[in-house]
């Protein structure tokens, strides 16, 4: 099987089947269930004694191709598609941590993730402990015998910090703690492959660069197959002790290195039900086929826009890991490839005579967003079209003011998911908006 990313995104996971029509494209298997060969075959499938399909809440042939393809792109051994990125996070964390346990993470997170960890997981009895930053020694200070995961983002949203994966993984593994990385901004493995640097589990909002066109919501969990669950039977009994739901089946024995993804699929996905539809899976497969082509343009456009903004007299600061001025630029050069990602943030200088008490929606930054014509003001990233948003008032709105600042979210921050349009048109859109807002006035 070819091993290059550009080829895998087109071919991985699709094997010739017994379909009499021999379709070249991956078919949409719009079926709820699958006919057993006989009664014994049905019993074997339900007992996890033989591989195969039972019901599309657990497995579906369309999704099977998607899962295998994403696992290949990320360097994992198995994957599980879910109904959204939030669902992927939920299953990944609850597959490791139970009531009374804790996970350790950073304040440098997407607002929806931070809120899910702080509020929703608390209701499940799972404590989330947040470090202000991403230094390995700071994470280690929060570990105890009940810590079941260290959770990071490969490119933090919205600070775009790139963690020092190798050092962080070494600290976590020293304590028998698996590392879970949300690689959404790593674009399906195109910009970043955390498993290569020791991460154990990778999640994605497949809605973003994997789908790439803003047409469907989905998520995925990828299992590296490398964490030694058998070495920690008391810490992770769900893999080493008999399963109550499968008459004593032991996941470590039944699934080997894929024990984690096997457990999440056959117990959590089965019982909680956040399944991806085959129609959505098909759309994500369509997106995957051009991922490297789009990713290259996203990355080059983002760097050029960041450089333009950094030189603009209307801009007070720019945050993009591809700029030497970014605090994590050296880590970005070490851990990112094919570019530095497709998202950046910047702040706009104040209009003359602006005051702290002014209506925030009349501030220069809000006006710049409102006067953009090509870029769309909406809550998404990874679309082929350029998108903008003010996270302080939207994606991170549920956080307290202190939590927003800890996450790197300020009132003047404008996040840009840079699309694949011609870069001169993107820059011209921002230039025209600046000219309209400032109208010949010098920024303060």
Swiss-Prot record:
It is found in: Cytoplasm. It is an enzyme of class 2 (transferase). Keywords: Amino-acid biosynthesis, Cysteine biosynthesis, Cytoplasm, Methionine biosynthesis, Pyridoxal phosphate, Transferase. GO terms for cellular component: cytoplasm. The modification N6-(pyridoxal phosphate)lysine is found at residue 208. Transmembrane segments: none annotated. It holds the Pfam family Cys_Met_Meta_PP. It catalyses: O-acetyl-L-homoserine + methanethiol = L-methionine + acetate + H(+); O-acetyl-L-homoserine + hydrogen sulfide = L-homocysteine + acetate; O-acetyl-L-serine + hydrogen sulfide = L-cysteine + acetate. InterPro entries: Cys/Met-Metab_PyrdxlP-dep_enz, Cys_met_metab_PP, OAc-hSer/O-AcSer_sulfhydrylase, PyrdxlP-dep_Trfase, PyrdxlP-dep_Trfase_major, PyrdxlP-dep_Trfase_small. CDD domains: CGS_like. One of its GO terms (biological process) is transsulfuration. Pathway: Amino-acid biosynthesis; L-methionine biosynthesis via de novo pathway; L-homocysteine from O-acetyl-L-homoserine; Amino-acid biosynthesis; L-cysteine biosynthesis; L-cysteine from L-serine: step 2/2. Its EC number is 2.5.1.47, 2.5.1.49. It comes from the Eukaryota. Its cofactor is pyridoxal 5'-phosphate. One of its GO terms (molecular function) is pyridoxal phosphate binding. Catalyzes the conversion of O-acetyl-L-homoserine (OAH) into homocysteine in the methionine biosynthesis pathway. Also catalyzes the conversion of O-acetylserine (OAS) into cysteine, the last step in the cysteine biosynthesis pathway. Homotetramer. Belongs to the trans-sulfuration enzymes family. NCBIfam families: OAH_OAS_sulfhy. This is Homocysteine/cysteine synthase. It comes from Kluyveromyces lactis (strain ATCC 8585 / CBS 2359 / DSM 70799 / NBRC 1267 / NRRL Y-1140 / WM37) (Yeast).
